[in-house]
UniProtKB/Swiss-Prot annotation:
Belongs to the UreE family. It comes from Flavobacterium johnsoniae (strain ATCC 17061 / DSM 2064 / JCM 8514 / BCRC 14874 / CCUG 350202 / NBRC 14942 / NCIMB 11054 / UW101) (Cytophaga johnsonae). Involved in urease metallocenter assembly. Binds nickel. Probably functions as a nickel donor during metallocenter assembly. This is Urease accessory protein UreE. GO terms for biological process: protein folding; protein-containing complex assembly; urea metabolic process.
């Protein structure tokens, strides 16, 4: 089965009289445009997103018919939670994490990142309130360079030059 786009969110579908099958993925697989996986019920799934910037989210429906529905399930993992005491501290910790080019998630006014012992110790030593938790990382901050084309017409420089004409 080849999937080219997301059908919608699970809450938008009536699952009555349908088998709900889950496609389990790790948080870092949610941004991959091309991948092959097996659902929990053994269905082979090939994801081939044609548009750049498409990302799988927890409970996205990637296939639906009258009998079955396949839903994305982002697997929980060990994570670092930083609970900023103020908006200024939120900005500082996001800057520090982003400066190290680490993946960062914002959920429930907390900053989360995949657990790595050295990063946990560094954040704690820097005075931030940190905890190690087992949770689902779902709301990634788009802090890195966006996917882009390699043709001349898609470069930012080319677009600015066209505006200036």
């Amino acid at each position: 089965m080849i999937i080219n786009e997301i059908e919608g969110s699970l809450r938008e579908f009536d699952i009555t009289n349908r088998v709900v099958d889950y496609l389990e993925i790790e948080w870092f697989e949610s941004t991959k445009r091309i991948q092959r996986k097996k659902s929990k019920n053994g269905q082979e799934v090939a994801i081939k997103f044609l548009k750049e910037g498409q990302r799988l989210k927890h409970e996205d429906v990637i296939y639906a018919d009258d009998q079955k529905i396949i839903v994305v399930d982002i697997i929980p993992c060990d994570a670092i939670v930083v609970k900023p005491k103020s908006l200024l501290e939120m900005g500082n910790v996001c800057y520090e994490i982003g400066n190290k080019h680490l993946p960062m998630f914002i959920q429930n006014d907390e900053v989360l990142l995949p657990f790595e012992e050295p990063i946990f110790k560094w954040l704690s030593a820097s005075g931030y309130h940190t905890e190690k938790v087992f949770t689902r990382l779902t709301n990634i901050v788009n802090s890195t360079v966006q996917p882009h084309g390699h043709s001349e017409s898609s470069s930012l420089f080319f677009k600015i030059m066209n505006i200036a004409k």
